[in-house]
Amino acid sequence: MIKRVNKLVLGISLLFLVISITAGCDMGKEEEIKKSFEKTLSMYPIKNLEDLYDKEGYRDDQFDKNDKGTWIIGSEMATQNKGEALKVKGMVLYMNRNTRSAKGFYYVNAVKKDEDGRPQDNKIEYPVKMVDNKIIPTKDIKDGNIKKEIENFKFFAQYGTFKDLSKYKDGDISYNPEVPSYSAKYQLTNDDYNVKQLRKRYDIPTNKAPKLLLKGSGDLKGSSVGYKDIEFTFVEKKGENTFFTDSLHLEPSEDK
């Protein structure tokens, strides 16, 4: 009887030890993920995008020694009401630190599925450039609404803020060392500053508070290969979605 009790106690102790170690590993990985994103997100808000020409980013052996790199900044809003196409609007800008010039495109898309259930892309791109911190179309645009959307467009990095990532706690952590890929997901409230800013700028068809997802690939300590995105997920289910994505990272320039 005593042996059985001792075995039971030992088994319970080992179980608690495993749980403690697992929890500790998750907490450690969560802090690593936050630290990995913090290097870039701590720069937000960047009200004048031209400040990025003087901002250093992560560099590795993929960069030529004379290449200052190109910042790639993107923001995108996607909404899909039940039974409708996924409507996407966003912008990507390539900011070359060597030439101190920026070009990119504004885009709209309506993703539908064909009879076989395969998504059909209907993306339309409108080339743009940035001069004196203003986004300007480089070709004539007949659609007045699109022209106005481009003129009024602001990247999330210009108004979002992540000065204190430590306030986000107990996230849903995922890490795959084989890829490698990683993510941390947090439930937000509608009182969150960034959520208020998104609702102010976009017609978000739900009152549900979003989840914040920090997701990336590549070496957690830093890499020019891979990606780091942040996503605010308001609705995520079959045939109905609402989410906002943002990214900012430095890559080797095509023209050194």
From Swiss-Prot:
Lipidation (N-palmitoyl cysteine): 25
Membrane topology (UniProt): Lipid-anchor
Lipidation positions, renumbered (S-diacylglycerol cysteine): 25
Protein location: Cell membrane
Family label: Belongs to the staphylococcal tandem lipoprotein family.
Signal peptide boundaries: 1-24
Superkingdom, natural source: Bacteria
Source organism of this protein record: Staphylococcus aureus
Protein name: Uncharacterized lipoprotein in plc 3'region
GO cellular component: plasma membrane
Keywords from the named record: Cell membrane, Lipoprotein, Membrane, Palmitate, Signal
Cell membrane is among the record's keywords: yes
InterPro entries on file: Csa, Csa_sf
Pfam families to which the protein is assigned, alphabetical: DUF576 (PF04507)
